[in-house]
C-alpha cells in the first residue's frame, strides 16, 4: 500500500504566487476586479511620488535667492547659511557694530590732537584705518569685528611719549610698527601660547585694569576734573561748564549702559555737543560737511631705526601686551559666541583674525594711527545676530561715509568725549576682580602694576615694574620655580630700563 509523502510545513505555509492566484480566479468578474484594484494602487503610488517631487522642486525654487550667479558666489564665500545667519541679520549686526564703535573717530583724534597733531588730518587717517582694517577683517578673517586704534595705545603715544617729551611722533609710530611685526611673527609661527605662558597670569590680568586706570585718568584730565597742582594732582573747577557736562555725561552713560541701550556712546556725544552750543563749548566754524583733509603730513612719517633703542623696550612691550591680550580676548569671546549661538560644528580658525589684526597694526603705524586693535564692542554685532565677515563690510562702509563729516568731528568738544573715555576706563578696571587674592606672591605684583601706573601716569612703566616685582617677590618667597625661564631673560632688560630712567 502506497503512502502519501508528508508535505513540508514550509511548503504548506508558503503563500501562493501571483500566477497561481490569478489562475485560481475562475470567474471573469473576479479577474477584472483584481486588475482594477492593481491599477488603483499604482495610480495612488504614482500620485504620491509626483506630489513629493513637485514639492521638492518648489522648495528649491523658493530657497534660491533671486540674485545673479556672480553675486551669489560673492555672498556664499562668507558661509552665511553654514553659520546659521541671513543677509538681513548681517546688515543689522553691521549697523550695531558701527553705532557701538563710531565714537572712536571722535575720541581718538581729540586725544592725538592734544599731542600737537593736526586734528583734521588725524581724523582722516583714523577713519581710513578703521574702514580698511574692518573691511580686511570681513574679507579675510570672516568675523563680525571692528578694528580701530585702541584707547590704551593712543593714550600711551599721545600723553606719555609725545606730550611729555619722551619721544617724537615718528619714533612712537616705529614702536607701534615693531610691536605689530612681533605680533605677526608670533601668529605665523604659532607661538602665541608660548608668550602667554611666559607672562605671569596675575600680570596678564592686571594689564587690562592698568590700561583702564590710565584711560580714565586721561578722561578726567581732558575734562578739567583733575589738574596739576604744585606738588601733586588737585581737584579741578567742578563749577565750570566743561566739568558739569562731563559729570552729567558720565551719569547718563552709566544709566544707558546699565539698560543696554544700543549706541549709548553716540547718544551722549551728540547730546552734549548740542547742549554745548549755547554754553560756548561747541564751536561751529564753517560747513559741517566737506572733503576730508589731506593726511599727507602723517603718511609714512615713521622712524623705524630710532625706535629700536633698548631704552624703549618697556614701551614696546606695553604696546605688544595691550594689543596681544586685548585681541586674543576679543577674538576668543566672539568666536565662542558665534559657535554657541549658531549651533553648528563649523570650526572657526582664530589664526586668520590674528593675522589681520597684526597686519593692521603695521599698516596703521604707516598711516599715522597707533595701536590698531580689535574692539570689545564688536560683541554687539554677535549679539545682534552677526556671524560672518559680511557684518564687518557693512560697518566698514558706514565708517567710509564718515569721511565727508570730518569738519563736524572737529567741532565736538572734549566735554562730550571725556565721559566715554572715563566710562570705558572704569569698565576695564573692573577686570581686576579676577586676580587670585589668596596668594600674595600673585596679588602683590598685580597691585604694583596698578599703583605705579596711577602714580607715574604711564602704564608701560607700571607693567615693567610689575614684571620686575614679580621676579623679586617670587625669589624672596622661595618660589623661584614658579618663574618661567623667559622671565629670567626679560629681567636684565627691565633692570636696565629703570637704571636708565633714574
Predicted regions and their residues:
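Low-acidity, Ser/Thr- and Arg-rich intrinsically disordered low-complexity segments
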Residues: 3-24, 31, 47
